[in-house]
């Protein structure tokens, strides 16, 4: 019987792995023509064909308004009509950083994804008397990643580039580059 399980929670939020992160990354590197064009080309070739959400299909989503959040349901008139009791508290991001991408990631870590995921995981694992650990949420790792400039979060068209580089020697490419 298993006593401990390792979770991947926090990896996308700490290392930058979501679709909207890619669009914010393009915004972050917009003044570095080479880096911008390289990422945009890879994004169009490898990522865009897999995106079903119409809000994430525009690579310049944040160029006109860096506070754009129409993809979040309580800002979206189309989606609001499906709720019987729309939320009264409109989603507002807290300000942590002048970097659009870092600010988004920090909101996900402290208020959005991570608290919800870890709570659900803890309940599910406790149901089976298994201890859940989330190594990507290690405080020192988190603090280190806060010192890394956003331009290093993605490279060669890959999200979570730093994480992929770290595990290069230990994980086969067919898993690492998936």
Q: Can you say where each PLM-predicted feature lies in the sequence?
A:
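ATP-dependent adenylate-handling active sites, centered on carboxylate activation for C-N bond formation
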Residues: 1-90, 123-170
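PAPS-dependent sulfotransferase catalytic core
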Residues: 171-178
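Short, flexible segments with low predicted structural confidence
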Residues: 96-98, 112-117, 139
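Short Ser/Thr-interspersed hydrophobic loop/turn segments at strand-loop and sheet-helix junctions
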Residues: 109-123, 145
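Residue-level recognition of hydrophobic positions within alpha-helical transmembrane segments
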Residues: 9, 104, 117-118, 134
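Structural motif
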Residues: 95-109
């Amino acid at each position: 019987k298993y006593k401990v399980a390792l979770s991947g929670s926090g990896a996308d939020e700490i290392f930058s792995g979501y679709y909207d992160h890619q669009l914010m990354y393009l915004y972050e590197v917009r003044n570095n023509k080479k880096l911008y064009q390289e990422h945009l080309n890879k994004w169009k070739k490898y990522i865009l064909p897999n995106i079903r959400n119409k809000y994430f299909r525009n690579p310049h989503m944040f160029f006109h308004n860096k506070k754009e959040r129409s993809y979040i349901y309580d800002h979206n008139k189309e989606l609001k009509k499906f709720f019987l009791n729309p939320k009264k508290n409109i989603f507002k991001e807290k300000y942590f950083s002048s970097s659009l991408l870092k600010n988004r990631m920090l909101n996900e870590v402290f208020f959005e994804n991570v608290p919800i995921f870890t709570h659900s995981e803890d309940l599910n694992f406790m149901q089976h008397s298994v201890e859940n650990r989330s190594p990507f949420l290690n405080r020192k790792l988190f603090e280190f990643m806060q010192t890394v400039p956003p331009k290093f979060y993605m490279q060669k068209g890959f999200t979570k580039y730093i994480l992929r580089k770290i595990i290069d020697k230990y994980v086969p490419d067919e898993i690492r580059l998936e």
